[in-house]
UniProtKB/Swiss-Prot annotation:
Stretches of the chain found on the membrane's Intravirion side: 1-12, 98-125, 169-203, 260-263, 315-344
Gene: gM
Keywords from the UniProt entry: Disulfide bond, Glycoprotein, Host endosome, Host Golgi apparatus, Host membrane, Host nucleus, Membrane, Transmembrane, Transmembrane helix, Viral envelope protein, Virion
Similarity comment: Belongs to the herpesviridae glycoprotein M family.
Organism: Human herpesvirus 6B (strain Z29)
Coiled-coil ranges per UniProt: none
Role noted for this protein: Envelope glycoprotein important for virion assembly and egress. Plays a role in the correct incorporation of gH-gL into virion membrane. Directs the glycoprotein N (gN) to the host trans-Golgi network.
Spans through the membrane: 13-33, 77-97, 126-146, 148-168, 204-224, 239-259, 264-284, 294-314
Cross-referenced Pfam families: Herpes_glycop
Assembly notes: Interacts (via N-terminus) with gN (via N-terminus). The gM-gN heterodimer forms the gCII complex.
Species lineage: Viruses, Duplodnaviria, Heunggongvirae, Peploviricota, Herviviricetes
HAMAP family hit by this protein: HSV_GM
Membrane topology of this protein: Multi-pass membrane protein
Highest taxon of the lineage: Viruses
Name of this protein: Envelope glycoprotein M
Length: 344
């Protein structure tokens, strides 16, 4: 049976959105590579936003100087940008593979089956959300290169919102593995492999979302700390507490709602733990530089985040392994129900 007109239109729009996402990925990749080299139009190295070794407090105490707050070190920033670029590449490959599989199996006897497959894999809206993620991430890195920390914090906030929306869209369009295997074995056996692929993509994306939650806290507080007069230690505590509150909210939403769609959803908790561990190294450097008596409190707050993340990992693992058995009761017929009514 030939594809319906609705399937044809949706398939063409989906193909155009994937092409746009691929072009955006090429643009962002070239930008992220070029920004690492001097004399290419970028004034500063984006990863040296908080170089504590080059600070001289006796000489750089003017009002127009950037205040050095708690932030991750250059190696961590470079690794974060690199891993995000790899994640972008993996998502592009996922969309291309899904598009190829749909084109190779679009002959079906079911009306609008292609539209349902596209919706399950990642429709046009998720593609454009992915484009917004890449563009806002590019803007964030560019703002760091120009030392515009307030603009960088604003750009990263938009990036984080788009990243969250993209993850929720992918997860909520996902059926359970049993239903997906059953549907694809009966209708489209060629699409069965996308179940595992999408699960991997979702967990890797959630892992980076968990780490980005930590990055959101320190980047937002870095922008606030350089926009208003506020103590550096207050900014440091605010960064960790923002990370803690946001991570707890996201973890509760995952366990309460999103696990109904994807059971093996461990990525966010692993990213949350990696964020807590990654932030511990800058705190030790922060203590050495400022000789702050508050470093113990910072470590305690960060340890709470790590413990909570481990607790959520154990909770998700237990809920994933323990299968609830439904007990089926025999339906009551008319006679038995009348006897029960008489007894009552």
């Amino acid at each position: 049976m030939a594809s319906s007109r609705v399937d044809t239109i949706n398939l063409r729009i989906w193909l155009v959105s994937i092409i746009c996402a691929a072009l955006s990925f090429i643009n962002v990749t070239v930008h992220l590579i070029a920004i690492n080299f001097p004399n290419l139009g970028f004034p500063c190295a984006y990863f040296e936003i908080n170089d504590l070794k080059a600070v001289n407090l006796s000489a750089n105490n003017e009002i127009y100087q950037m205040t050095h707050q708690l932030y991750i070190n250059p190696v961590q920033i470079i690794c974060y940008v690199l891993i995000m670029a790899i994640l972008f590449l993996l998502i592009i490959i996922y969309y291309i593979v899904c598009c190829a599989k749909v084109f190779s199996s679009n002959k079906t006897s079911n009306v609008n089956q292609t539209t349902r497959d596209i919706t399950w894999m990642g429709d046009t809206s998720s593609c454009f959300q992915f484009i917004l993620i890449m563009d806002t991430f590019q803007l964030f890195v560019t703002a760091l290169s120009f030392r515009l920390v307030a603009l960088g914090a604003f750009a990263y906030s938009i990036f984080f919102v788009c990243f969250t929306t993209f993850n929720v869209t992918l997860i909520t369009q996902f059926q359970s593995a049993d239903k997906s295997f059953f549907a694809f074995q009966k209708i489209h056996p060629n699409l069965k492999g996308t179940v595992q692929f999408k699960t991997v993509v979702i967990n890797l994306s959630e892992l980076m979302l968990g780490y980005s939650t930590m990055f959101l806290g320190i980047t937002t507080c870095l922008g606030v700390g350089n926009s208003i007069y506020i103590r550096s230690i207050t900014v440091a505590f605010s960064s960790i507490n923002t990370f803690l509150v946001m991570a707890c909210i996201y973890s509760i939403v995952i366990e309460a709602v999103l696990v109904r769609y994807v059971k093996p959803l461990f990525g966010y908790y692993v990213g949350m733990f990696c964020g807590a561990v990654g932030l511990s190294f800058p705190i030790l450097q922060y203590e050495t530089f400022f000789e702050s008596e508050w470093s113990t409190g910072l470590i305690i707050n960060l340890s709470v985040v790590a413990i909570i993340s481990i607790g959520f990992i154990i909770c998700r693992l237990v809920r994933y392994l323990v299968k609830k058995k439904r007990r089926y009761k025999q339906l009551l017929n008319a006679e038995s129900s009348s006897l029960m009514d008489e007894n009552e």
